[in-house]
Regions:
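Short, conserved, surface-exposed binding loops centered on an aromatic residue
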Residues: 30, 39-41, 75
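Acidic-basic catalytic patches of nuclease active cores, encompassing PD-(D/E)XK
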Residues: 1-29, 154
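Catalytic cores of nucleic-acid endonucleases
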Residues: 54-110
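Hydrophobic/aromatic beta-strand patches that form the interior of the parallel beta-sheet core
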Residues: 47-49, 82, 120-122
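Domain-level recognition of nuclease-like catalytic cores that cleave nucleotide substrates
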Residues: 88-154
């Protein structure tokens, strides 16, 4: 992961910790063998945040998480999975790419199959820079807005 992605991940964790202090938030949490960008735990409630920058197959992340949760790799009564999608998944003609649609489909199916699990796709209103490119000037505000959206859901 690049330094910008790490900075965004840290900013989101810090904002979530301020907004929802009852959760113990950490970055790079593992669910079985799958690393999750940000995770928070409050008693028997777990929140998982996966940030999709420009992954070729974001549905794979969703499927792996729900597979591990189905195998009870994470003991919790309620698990909220938030999958954040950057502008990379937006189509110039409007709408979103099939990559994102597939990930959202897997999330919906996982939620229907597993009673204690909830999935939410979240727009992360940022176009990630190419490797070595400049960070968008408003990235901190975007991270803060996204953290508030997640916090309101929790």
């Amino acid at each position: 992961m690049g330094s910008f992605a790490t900075a965004v991940q840290s900013r989101l964790r810090e904002r979530l910790a301020a907004l929802r202090p009852r959760f113990d938030w950490e970055t790079e949490h593992h669910v079985a063998a799958t690393p999750v960008d940000i995770a928070g735990r409050a008693d028997s409630h777990v929140a998982l945040v996966e940030l999709e920058w420009r992954r070729a197959d974001p549905a794979d992340n969703t499927a792996k998480l729900f597979r591990h949760l189905d195998e009870e790799a994470l003991a919790a009564d309620v698990v909220d999975v938030f999958q954040l999608f950057t502008g990379y998944y937006d189509l110039a003609s409007g709408g979103v790419s099939s990559k994102r649609l597939n990930a959202e489909f897997v999330g919906r199916v996982g939620t229907q199959a597993l009673d204690s699990f909830r999935y939410r796709a979240v727009d992360f209103a940022l176009d990630p820079p190419q490797r070595g490119g400049d960070r968008p000037k408003d990235w901190e505000g975007v991270a803060d807005t996204t953290a508030r959206e997640i916090g309101e859901y929790l």
